[in-house]
């Protein structure tokens, strides 16, 4: 019988009958295809087709072990040809209030993903970021089906594409639906990178013209927006920034790469790369020594 987290050689542990392997950044993932993808994602991004294969295998396993729940999994995953189709279905299911609406919004998302395959690739990176950074979600299927922060972000990607195509009213409609259904409001004019993680996905507000870099993590109740004095200028958030719960970032400011914003912090001035901002108003701490990379 395996002892919980009994170390073998420092590279893996045993827990719950599974062999969990240690990733390059010290996180453990189960020895499954999804777990191996998580480890691979530390070295580079897994292609969409390979990710989709892993998701389908997880869905097939669920269908075999739990036929009652498996029927829902079939509709969400196995009935679709590719990752974009499954994403479109999830967006429609989450935003629609009746069958006709769900079909309509799913069709809109599908058309956008077909017109811009890059958005599907971006979604795959977002999903991999969840698995790589949240040990509580070692598989791909649960966040895809149940994590509203992930779906809200993909709905925003659709609305942002529509906004850039000058389909303003439809873009704003999707924002409103996402806010109502998912408690995440991201303006279609914002700019957001990839490998972005909306943990908990509740109470997140990103205002117009905000710029969010790659690998940013949002906790719940984060607000990023403009000030009344400069309505055309919004915050710019760098790569790898961690935004703790209740953080508020306002105005024409920059938050540098890999900075951390503390819980409940109100930031109205620039935060240099690698620094931590805490308090109300924010003060800086734990900044890198001069000449040392953040």
Question: Where are the regions a protein language model picked out?
Answer:
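Terminal amphipathic alpha-helical/low-complexity segments used for targeting or macromolecular assembly
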Residues: 2, 13-21, 26-177, 294
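Structural signal for interior beta-strand "rungs" in well-ordered beta-sheet cores
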Residues: 179-289
């Amino acid at each position: 019988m395996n002892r919980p987290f009994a170390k073998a050689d420092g590279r893996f542990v045993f827990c719950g009958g599974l062999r969990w392997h240690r990733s390059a950044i010290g996180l453990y993932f189960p020895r499954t295809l999804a777990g191996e993808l998580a480890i691979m994602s530390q070295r580079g991004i897994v292609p969409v087709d390979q990710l989709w294969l892993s998701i389908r295998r997880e869905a097939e396993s669920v269908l075999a072990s739990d036929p009652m729940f498996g029927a829902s999994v079939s509709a969400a995953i196995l009935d679709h040809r590719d990752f974009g189709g499954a994403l479109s279905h999830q967006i429609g299911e989450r935003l629609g209030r009746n069958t006709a609406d769900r079909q309509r919004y799913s069709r809109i998302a599908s058309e956008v993903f077909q017109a811009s395959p890059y958005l599907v690739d971006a979604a795959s990176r977002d999903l991999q970021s969840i698995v790589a950074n949240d040990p509580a979600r070692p598989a791909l299927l649960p966040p895809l089906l149940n994590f509203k922060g992930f779906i809200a972000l993909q709905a925003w990607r659709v609305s942002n594409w529509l906004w850039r195509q000058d389909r303003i009213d439809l873009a704003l409609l999707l924002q409103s639906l996402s806010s109502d259904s998912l408690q995440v409001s991201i303006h279609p004019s914002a700019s957001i990178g990839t490998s972005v993680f909306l943990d908990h996905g509740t109470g997140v507000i990103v205002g117009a013209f905000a710029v969010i870099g790659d690998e940013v993590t949002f906790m719940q109740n984060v607000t990023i927006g403009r000030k009344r004095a400069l309505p055309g200028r919004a915050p710019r958030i760098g790569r790898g920034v961690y935004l703790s719960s209740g953080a508020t970032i306002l105005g024409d400011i920059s938050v540098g790469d890999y900075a951390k914003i503390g819980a409940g912090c109100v930031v109205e001035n620039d935060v240099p790369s690698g620094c931590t901002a805490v308090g109300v108003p924010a003060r800086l701490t734990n900044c890198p020594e001069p000449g040392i990379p953040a």
